[in-house]
Regions:
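Histidine-rich, glycine-flanked metal-binding segment
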Residues: 9-53
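Detector for glycine-centered tight turns/loop "hinges" at secondary-structure junctions
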Residues: 14, 115-116, 131
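Short beta-strand scaffold segments in enzyme catalytic cores
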Residues: 21-23, 109, 122-124
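Short low-complexity, flexible loop/linker segments enriched in glycine and/or proline
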Residues: 45, 117-118, 122-127
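Metal-associated gating/positioning segment near the N- to mid-region
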Residues: 50-117
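Metal-coordinating catalytic core of metallo-dependent amide/deamination hydrolases
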Residues: 124-146
Length: 146
């Protein structure tokens, strides 16, 4: 169990704490409250003077798609490229993903560029992970459109 103590906590439910604690178990938040008694076996982070809030979802991003000279997210071979899949243009080794995590962005919906009228299919990815396959949350071309 990980306990983050003494942070200024903002929750998605609107319940905020000037000085609050967060309990995390197996990578999931299990409690947010004014005070959590931390047992000796718990890992504890003192977040005094720091903020804690839900991760930000960037609903329109080109992160990792314009990393080099390729400009793979901007497919401009014709006016409409509806079958262009942003998944195959994303480079997760760029520093963009590290910057996103530091900024609090935990999920990005990566879209093709605006080089044409219909750019293609988006892909939702986590900011953390070791490979695009691990980071991908939703890729319509691979998982259907549900």
């Amino acid at each position: 169990m990980l306990v983050i103590k003494n942070a200024r906590v903002f929750t998605a439910a609107g319940r905020n704490y000037d000085k609050g604690d967060i309990a995390v178990e197996n990578g999931k938040i299990v409690a947010v409250t004014e005070s959590i008694e931390a047992k000796d076996s718990y890992d504890v982070i003192d977040a005094s003077g720091l903020f804690a809030m839900p991760g930000i979802v960037d609903a329109h991003s080109h992160i990792g798609g314009f990393a080099g000279y390729d400009q793979d997210l901007n497919e401009m071979t014709c006016n409409a490229t509806p079958s262009m899949e942003s998944f195959y243009a994303i480079d997760v080794t760029t520093k963009d993903f590290q910057r996103a995590k530091r900024a609090g962005i935990t999920t990005s919906v990566i879209a093709p560029g605006s080089g044409n009228v219909v750019g293609g299919l988006v892909c939702a990815v986590k900011s953390a992970g070791s490979s695009l396959e691990d980071m991908c949350i939703k890729n319509p071309s691979m998982h259907g459109s549900d």
